[in-house]
UniProtKB/Swiss-Prot annotation:
It catalyses: (6R)-5,10-methylene-5,6,7,8-tetrahydrofolate + NADP(+) = (6R)-5,10-methenyltetrahydrofolate + NADPH; (6R)-5,10-methenyltetrahydrofolate + H2O = (6R)-10-formyltetrahydrofolate + H(+). NADP(+) binds at G165, R166, S167, S190. The gene is folD. The keyword NADP applies. Keywords: Amino-acid biosynthesis, Histidine biosynthesis, Hydrolase, Methionine biosynthesis, Multifunctional enzyme, NADP, One-carbon metabolism, Oxidoreductase, Purine biosynthesis. It comes from Staphylococcus epidermidis (strain ATCC 35984 / DSM 28319 / BCRC 17069 / CCUG 31568 / BM 3577 / RP62A). Transmembrane segments: none annotated. Homodimer. This is Bifunctional protein FolD. The lineage of its organism: Bacteria, Bacillati, Bacillota, Bacilli, Bacillales. Its EC number is 1.5.1.5, 3.5.4.9. Gene3D superfamilies: Leucine Dehydrogenase, chain A, domain 1, NAD(P)-binding Rossmann-like Domain. GO terms for biological process: L-histidine biosynthetic process; methionine biosynthetic process; purine nucleotide biosynthetic process; tetrahydrofolate interconversion. GO terms for cellular component: cytosol. One of its GO terms (molecular function) is methenyltetrahydrofolate cyclohydrolase activity. InterPro entries: Aminoacid_DH-like_N_sf (IPR046346), NAD(P)-bd_dom_sf (IPR036291), THF_DH/CycHdrlase (IPR000672), THF_DH/CycHdrlase_cat_dom (IPR020630), THF_DH/CycHdrlase_NAD-bd_dom (IPR020631).
Amino acid sequence: MVAKILDGKQIAKEYRQRLKNQVNDLKEYGFTPKLSVILVGNDGASQSYVKSKKKAAEKIGMISEIIHLDESTSEEVVLSELNRLNNDDTVSGILVQVPLPKQVSEQKVLEAINPEKDVDGFHPINIGKLYIDEQTFVPCTPLGIMEILKHADINLEGKNAVVIGRSHIVGQPVSKLLLQANATVTILHSRTKNMNAHLKQADVIVSAVGQPGLVTKENVKKGAVIIDVGNTPDENGKLKGDVAYDEIKEIASAITPVPGGVGPLTITMVLNNTLLAEKLRRGLTK
C-alpha cells in the first residue's frame, strides 16, 4: 500500500477560488472584506508569515493591511491600536501575529480583540462557543485539517482518532472538531504513558507537537490516515514534520506532506474566517 498524498497546496487553491467567488458576490452588495494584521517587532518568520497572509487576502479580492509596530512598543499602545481597529467599521477581521515581545501580554491582547472580528478564533468567547457547538470562528489550523479530511472523503464517524498535543491553537480545538464529526478521540501529551499502544489503535492520527520523527512506522497501523502539523526547521532550514514521512507513506492510506500539507490550509482558513466575519456583521449569512 502506498498512501494517498493529501496535497494541501491543491486543496487550498480550490478552496481559495471558492472564497474569491464569494468575495466577488459580496462586492455586489457594496462590501469588501478587510483583514488587519498587527505585527510587533522584527521576527523574520513572523514578517514572512504576515506578508503571506496579506498577499493571499489580496489575491482573492480582499483588502489587507499590516500595522507594523516597533519591537519596543508598549502594551498600552498595542491595546490602543486594537481598540481603533475594533471600532473601525471598514475592518472585518483582526489578528495579532505571535509571538509578541515580552512587555506585551499575549493573553491581554487576544482578549482585547472584538470577538466578532477575531478571525484567529483565540478569544475566550469564541473558544467557549466552539465547545458548546455554537457558530463561531474556529482556529485556522484545526479548521484546515478538517477541510483536508473532508476533501479526501474520509468518514470519521466511529473512527479512533488520536491527537498528539494539547495546545489551545491546534490539539484541543481539533479534538473538539473530530468529536463533532463523531470520531472517538484520544489526546496524547508529554505525560501520556505507553503512547505507542494508543497510536497503534488509531484510524486517524493528528500530530502537532513539533518533534521530528515522533511518529514512526512501528507505531502506526496499516491503513491509518496521518495528518502532520509539525513544521520544525532542521540545521539546514528545511522543514521537518512530526512524522517519519518516507517510511509511513508505505503503510498509511493517506498522509499530509511537510511542507505543503496543513500549512497552506491554515492561511486559507484565515481568509475563510475573514469572509465569515464580514458576512455575519452585514447580516448576509443564511
